């Protein structure tokens, strides 16, 4: 399955200014916050990536999958990598996850492809 999401970078900037760390901690782990380096475009991209993953799994963010069940890191070539907690990888019977993030014209867009025998 494939999931896609697009986010306004300005909307994310407003949330960060208004709620500061409380906003970030709702959907990012401490290591993900460090990876974003306070860049609104990176924060928006990470938000979009987690939303895209939830859509690829056909559950959205909620009871079956929370933002913090997903972890974003970077490859040695700085490409985004996404994984889920072991519990969720098993729950969804995920074999692999592939991800891409792009930013342009004030928006961040992300795509996730999930390989699973359940989907």
Swiss-Prot record:
Localization (cell): Cytoplasm
Entry-linked Pfam families: ACPS
Enzyme class, first EC level, given as a word: transferase
One GO CC term on file: cytoplasm
EC numbers, comma separated: 2.7.8.7
Superkingdom of origin organism: Bacteria
Residues where Mg(2+) binds: 5, 51
Record family assignment: Belongs to the P-Pant transferase superfamily. AcpS family.
Functional note: Transfers the 4'-phosphopantetheine moiety from coenzyme A to a Ser of acyl-carrier-protein.
UniProt protein name: Holo-[acyl-carrier-protein] synthase
Species name: Helicobacter pylori (strain J99 / ATCC 700824) (Campylobacter pylori J99)
Gene: acpS
């Amino acid at each position: 399955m494939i999931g896609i999401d697009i986010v306004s970078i300005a909307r994310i900037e407003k949330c960060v200014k208004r709620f500061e760390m409380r906003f970030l901690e709702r959907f990012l782990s401490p290591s993900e916050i460090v990876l974003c380096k306070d860049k609104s475009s990176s924060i928006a991209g990470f938000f979009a990536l987690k939303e895209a993953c939830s859509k690829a799994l056909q559950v959205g963010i909620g009871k079956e999958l929370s933002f913090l069940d997903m972890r974003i890191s970077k490859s040695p070539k700085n490409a985004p990598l996404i994984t889920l907690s072991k519990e969720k990888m098993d729950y969804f019977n995920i074999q692999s996850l592939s991800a891409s993030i792009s930013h342009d014209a004030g928006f961040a867009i992300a795509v996730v492809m999930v390989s699973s025998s359940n989907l």
